[in-house]
């Protein structure tokens, strides 16, 4: 049984200057016609903007009176010469973002299986947003990109616009169902360069914001691990924190996240603190405490490198002679005294290095203990450098007390391995974005570096050979090796000279002495300038692009109140109409003379004051008749219409959409609606009148931009049991090609067959509707 409830809600997509269309009375069926439809379905046909179709069936207009669709339960009619697919004209009109495009149906059939090819099918008017008044299909997409897409159908060549970002063009291609590999070669680099840059800059981002939010949710404020940025960007404590945790699906503990809030049920110490400690040592931008840890690590890195350099200065080196008594190799001879020269550094430098190693050891153990993936941790080059730089110090301390020859050999080797400590300088890449940009630039410019090496190798080989034979011209016949008049005694020595000359260094240790050798040297210098000048600008451009994007991401303000779009609704450009629902079964408590649905109900989560429309009953939830914050109601709204009266505003059906189907909206739309279950997160302040975002200049249109929608969730159980939960109707479960999510309603707890309104159990948390 369908139960209709009209609730007021703000529809932001309606224009402020549009006048609501006047309701048109529903045409009455003749006396010989079948029994009238139930009031809910008649009410659907009595919407504003209703007009009669050529076949006499009323068409209900969507919000704003823009789109017309057949009323559910009535036979479909031909929707114009283009929309119905039965017209004699071969042209079709497509309105994309307000720009009308006209083409032939045969043009759209050139790429079968795409979205535009689906417009030529007979059922296109029922699947897409078709307006019979203007005889066109409407898509709310980028009109400039669509011009290139339509030209691809006409010419068979897909070009990329230069004034559109690559990811946007990729998103539009995915929406229209076109493969990106069809882009022409002349536009491929323009199409790919932005995506390549973003892929390379993914590592510049801080750890996952959701993980940071989960880490702060469980009491990071109490632990002193959050700051003003974290509290504004990802903290979940405070008002509505529990609701946000549920929307983040964090109540039971996510992967790598805390099991719950501080002291939450079922939470463990490890699941609460593991992500926080990991972010404390890994991400310097996660909290104020993480910044302090990063500064401490940076300080010890600089001290360790300074100590390493001072150990080689003669002012910190002490040379001492130690006499060691050793047995004589000659039998019966007295022991021999052997004097050994030992080099020792200042003791305080050793102590300073020991303090630095203790800090690095503590940091390394904390990171390896609390890392989420130890295998990936051990694969990191920076972590390997940490381990290799720490081990020699402990081995040297442990072997310093031994006097055996093997121990001394190991100590000598460890002193040589001390140079590994200088590699700690690469740990600075965690704290400076410019160093990370440089590393990514070198990796992204690998092909250019290989090309540069090949050019240099060819030039070195050619000019080293030429300088060797050029210096032999005019040489003394008695000087076979040419050591008396030239430095180039062989070709391998000429390799060094060619490298120094081609890179324009010119050390001066080797130079030609003959006129022929000087000519070869001049050609070598010119070739080196041209060889290096070709690939270097590409490397510089890569660095400039990566660095500018990295700086832009750092300076980008945090979106604390990001607007999350709603699922496609009737009248939306991406809305696809469902199949007409079947007639509802007769109510068991009514006679055969007619079908009377139960009185409309309003869930308490909807927040609608119905005290003026329905008297209290035994099955009416008290929250329905109680206004204000206590009853979650909204005072001051007009009462709901009585059953059978036409809805004064445009209807809106609550449907459950298929998120997995990417055909109508594509992956970008599914990603945009990923958190639609929780629209209260990161949204602007809501108006207490209609639960709509408050924006400057929007208060004046609240009284005009309202709409109602139908809640079709009452279906009595045939076995007489009490139904709990929300069940979708069969007619809505077969909808294909929609994206979005279903609305979360409070559980039902009403025996079937009750003549009163369905009672809805009070929710444990405030409704997010």
UniProtKB/Swiss-Prot annotation:
<dbReference type="GO" id="GO:0051260">
    <property type="term" value="P:protein homooligomerization"/>
</dbReference>
<keyword id="KW-0630">Potassium</keyword>
<feature type="modified residue" description="Phosphothreonine">
    <location>
        <position position="750"/>
    </location>
</feature>
<dbReference type="GO" id="GO:0045211">
    <property type="term" value="C:postsynaptic membrane"/>
</dbReference>
<keyword id="KW-0813">Transport</keyword>
<dbReference type="GO" id="GO:0043679">
    <property type="term" value="C:axon terminus"/>
</dbReference>
<feature type="short sequence motif" description="Selectivity filter">
    <location>
        <begin position="504"/>
        <end position="509"/>
    </location>
</feature>
<dbReference type="GO" id="GO:0030673">
    <property type="term" value="C:axolemma"/>
</dbReference>
<dbReference type="GO" id="GO:0030425">
    <property type="term" value="C:dendrite"/>
</dbReference>
<dbReference type="InterPro" id="IPR027359">
    <property type="entry name" value="Volt_channel_dom_sf"/>
</dbReference>
<feature type="region of interest" description="Disordered">
    <location>
        <begin position="202"/>
        <end position="231"/>
    </location>
</feature>
<dbReference type="GO" id="GO:0030866">
    <property type="term" value="P:cortical actin cytoskeleton organization"/>
</dbReference>
<feature type="topological domain" description="Cytoplasmic">
    <location>
        <begin position="541"/>
        <end position="769"/>
    </location>
</feature>
<dbReference type="InterPro" id="IPR003974">
    <property type="entry name" value="K_chnl_volt-dep_Kv3"/>
</dbReference>
<feature type="transmembrane region" description="Helical; Name=Segment S1">
    <location>
        <begin position="292"/>
        <end position="310"/>
    </location>
</feature>
<keyword id="KW-0472">Membrane</keyword>
<feature type="glycosylation site" description="N-linked (GlcNAc...) asparagine">
    <location>
        <position position="321"/>
    </location>
</feature>
<dbReference type="GO" id="GO:0042734">
    <property type="term" value="C:presynaptic membrane"/>
</dbReference>
<feature type="compositionally biased region" description="Pro residues">
    <location>
        <begin position="22"/>
        <end position="41"/>
    </location>
</feature>
<dbReference type="GO" id="GO:0005938">
    <property type="term" value="C:cell cortex"/>
</dbReference>
<dbReference type="InterPro" id="IPR005821">
    <property type="entry name" value="Ion_trans_dom"/>
</dbReference>
<feature type="transmembrane region" description="Helical; Name=Segment S6">
    <location>
        <begin position="519"/>
        <end position="540"/>
    </location>
</feature>
<feature type="modified residue" description="Phosphoserine">
    <location>
        <position position="734"/>
    </location>
</feature>
<feature type="binding site">
    <location>
        <position position="159"/>
    </location>
    <ligand>
        <name>Zn(2+)</name>
    </ligand>
</feature>
<keyword id="KW-0770">Synapse</keyword>
<keyword id="KW-0862">Zinc</keyword>
<feature type="modified residue" description="Phosphoserine">
    <location>
        <position position="731"/>
    </location>
</feature>
<dbReference type="GO" id="GO:1900242">
    <property type="term" value="P:regulation of synaptic vesicle endocytosis"/>
</dbReference>
<dbReference type="InterPro" id="IPR011333">
    <property type="entry name" value="SKP1/BTB/POZ_sf"/>
</dbReference>
<feature type="modified residue" description="Omega-N-methylarginine">
    <location>
        <position position="626"/>
    </location>
</feature>
<dbReference type="GO" id="GO:0006813">
    <property type="term" value="P:potassium ion transport"/>
</dbReference>
<keyword id="KW-1003">Cell membrane</keyword>
<dbReference type="GO" id="GO:0008076">
    <property type="term" value="C:voltage-gated potassium channel complex"/>
</dbReference>
<keyword id="KW-0633">Potassium transport</keyword>
<feature type="region of interest" description="Disordered">
    <location>
        <begin position="679"/>
        <end position="701"/>
    </location>
</feature>
<feature type="binding site">
    <location>
        <position position="165"/>
    </location>
    <ligand>
        <name>Zn(2+)</name>
    </ligand>
</feature>
<feature type="binding site">
    <location>
        <position position="504"/>
    </location>
    <ligand>
        <name>K(+)</name>
    </ligand>
</feature>
<keyword id="KW-0597">Phosphoprotein</keyword>
<feature type="region of interest" description="Important for normal N-type inactivation">
    <location>
        <begin position="1"/>
        <end position="80"/>
    </location>
</feature>
<keyword id="KW-0406">Ion transport</keyword>
<keyword id="KW-0325">Glycoprotein</keyword>
<feature type="binding site">
    <location>
        <position position="186"/>
    </location>
    <ligand>
        <name>Zn(2+)</name>
    </ligand>
</feature>
């Amino acid at each position: 049984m369908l139960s209709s409830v009209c609730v007021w809600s703000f529809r932001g997509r309606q224009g402020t200057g549009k006048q609501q269309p006047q309701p048109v009375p529903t045409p009455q069926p003749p006396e010989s016609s079948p029994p009238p439809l139930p009031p809910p379905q008649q009410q659907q046909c009595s919407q504003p903007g209703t007009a009669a179709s050529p076949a006499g069936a009323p068409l209900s207009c969507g919000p704003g009176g823009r789109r017309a669709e057949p009323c559910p339960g009535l036979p479909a009619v031909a929707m114009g010469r283009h929309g119905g697919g039965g017209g004699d004209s071969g042209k079709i009109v497509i309105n994309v973002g307000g720009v009308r495009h006209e083409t032939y149906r045969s043009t759209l059939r050139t790429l079968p299986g795409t979205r535009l090819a689906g417009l030529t099918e007979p059922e296109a008017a029922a699947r897409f947003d078709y307006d019979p008044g203007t005889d066109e299909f409407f898509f709310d997409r980028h009109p400039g990109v669509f011009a290139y897409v339509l030209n691809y159908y006409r010419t068979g060549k897909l070009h990329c616009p230069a004034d559109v970002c690559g990811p946007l063009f990729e998103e539009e291609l995915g929406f229209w169902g076109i493969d990106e590999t069809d882009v022409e070669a002349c536009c491929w680099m323009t199409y790919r360069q932005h995506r390549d840059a973003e892929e390379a800059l993914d590592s510049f981002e801080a750890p996952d914001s959701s993980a940071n939010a989960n880490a702060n949710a469980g009491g990071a404020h109490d632990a002193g691990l959050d700051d003003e940025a974290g509290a504004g960007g990802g903290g979940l404590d405070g008002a509505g924190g529990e609701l946000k945790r549920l929307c983040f699906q964090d109540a039971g503990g996510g992967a790598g996240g805390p099991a719950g809030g501080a002291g939450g049920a079922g939470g463990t110490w490890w699941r609460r603190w593991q992500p926080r400690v990991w972010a404390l040592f890994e991400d310097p931008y996660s909290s104020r405490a993480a910044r302090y840890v990063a500064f401490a690590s940076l300080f010890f890195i600089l001290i360790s490198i300074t100590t390493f350099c001072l150990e080689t200065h003669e002012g910190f080196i002490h040379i001492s002679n130690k006499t060691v008594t050793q047995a004589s190799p000659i039998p019966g001879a007295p022991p021999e005294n052997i004097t050994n020269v030992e080099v020792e550094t200042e003791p305080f430098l050793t102590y300073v290095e020991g303090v630095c190693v203790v800090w690095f050891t503590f940091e390394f153990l904390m990171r390896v203990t609390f890392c989420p993936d130890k295998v990936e941790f051990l694969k990191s080059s920076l972590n390997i450098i940490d381990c290799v730089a720490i081990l020699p110090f402990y081995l040297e301390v442990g072997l310093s007390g031994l006097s055996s020859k093997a121990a001394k050999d190991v100590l000598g080797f460890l002193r040589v391995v001390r140079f590994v400590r200088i590699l700690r300088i690469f740990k600075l890449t965690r704290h400076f974005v410019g160093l990370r940009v440089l590393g990514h630039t070198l990796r992204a410019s690998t092909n250019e570096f290989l090309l540069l090496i090949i050019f240099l190798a060819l030039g070195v080989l050619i000019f080293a050979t030429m300088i060797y034979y050029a210096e032999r011209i005019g040489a003394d016949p008695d000087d076979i090796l040419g050591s008396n008049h030239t430095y180039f005694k062989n070709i391998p020595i000429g390799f060094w000279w060619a490298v120094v000359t081609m890179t324009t260094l010119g050390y001066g240790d080797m130079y030609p002495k003959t006129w022929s050798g000087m000519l070869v040297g001049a050609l070598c210098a010119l070739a080196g300038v041209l060889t290096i000048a070709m690939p270097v600008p590409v490397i510089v451009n890569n660095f400039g692009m990566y660095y500018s994007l990295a700086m832009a991401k750092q300076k980008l303000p945090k979106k604390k109140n990001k607007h999350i779009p709603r699922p496609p609704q009737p009248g939306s450009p991406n809305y696809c109409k469902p199949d007409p629902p079947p007639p509802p079964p007769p109510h068991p408590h009514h006679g055969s003379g007619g079908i009377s649905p139960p009185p409309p109900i309003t869930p308490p989560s909807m927040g609608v004051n119905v005290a003026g429309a329905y008297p209290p009953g035994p099955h009416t939830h008290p929250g329905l008749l109680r206004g204000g914050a206590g009853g979650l109601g909204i005072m001051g709204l007009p009462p709901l219409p009585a059953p059978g009266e036409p809805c004064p505003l445009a209807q809106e059906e609550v449907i459950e959409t298929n998120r997995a189907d990417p055909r109508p909206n594509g992956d970008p739309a599914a990603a945009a609606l990923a958190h639609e279950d929780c629209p209260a997160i990161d949204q602007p302040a809501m108006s207490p009148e209609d639960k709509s975002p408050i924006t400057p200049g929007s208060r004046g249109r609240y009284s005009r931009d309202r709409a109602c929608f139908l809640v079709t969730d009452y279906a009595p159980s045939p076995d007489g049991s009490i139904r709990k939960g929300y069940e979708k109707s069969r007619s809505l479960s077969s909808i294909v090609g929609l994206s979005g999510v279903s609305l979360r309603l409070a559980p039902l707890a009403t025996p079937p067959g009750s003549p009163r309104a369905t009672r809805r159990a009070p929710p444990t948390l405030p409704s997010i509707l």
